[in-house]
Amino acid sequence: MADIFERLIKNYGPIGQHRERAHGYFAFPKLEGEIGSKMKFRGQEMIVWSLNNYLGLANHPAVRKADADATTKYGLALPMGARMMSGNSDLHEQLEAELASFEHKEDAILMNYGYQGIMSSIDAICGRHDVVVYDAECHACIIDGLRMLAGHRFVYKHNDIEDCEKQLLRAQALIDKQETGGILVITEGVFGMAGDQGKLKEVAALKNKFSFRLLVD
């Protein structure tokens, strides 16, 4: 019988085997300075591509003042605990209401981070009889969400509408055979790894031929 801990010591995995060169460089890098499009890395100013500060609001004076005021009033530990149990607050619900109003939606829900949001959405929407059809270059958060899926999934070639239609035909055939379930198509507005745009109009046009819901990351 193999010792699973012993295996971890002997096999560091595809990234771990480069740990001596990777650590502090392309794994766990240390950036210095204020949050921005340019920060210092190992003493040199670099362009930063991987921050979630998309709108550049992190250092806006009004945002920083709100951060400071909230820290003074509530401290850094409030709320504490899982939100469903003891971590909910009026501030959460107020922000959700404001976001929903801004987007002209009925309601909104906050997640800790976008990765969790997509994973949770797939899990919440799809059941074991449902089928997901998704682009081959979807982000890792979508792939991880699909790993939790009890139902079937079909992948189509990146931005290939003809192949997407083929996979929809397979999905529809499976739904017809099961006599239950629905179809969810997943793609992205802008593919984060390559930077190209998803063919949203073309995918949406397939709704003229097939019955499915569309999830765009």
Q: Which role does the model predict for each range below?
A:
Residues 110, 115-121, 141-142, 193:
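Short glycine/serine/threonine-rich phosphate/pyrophosphate-binding segments
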Residues 10-78, 212:
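N-terminal "arm"/small-domain region of PLP-dependent enzymes with the aminotransferase-like
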Residues 65-113:
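Conserved N-terminal alpha-helix of the aminotransferase class I/II PLP-enzyme fold
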Residues 154, 159-215:
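Active-site phosphate-binding strand-loop segment of PLP-dependent enzymes
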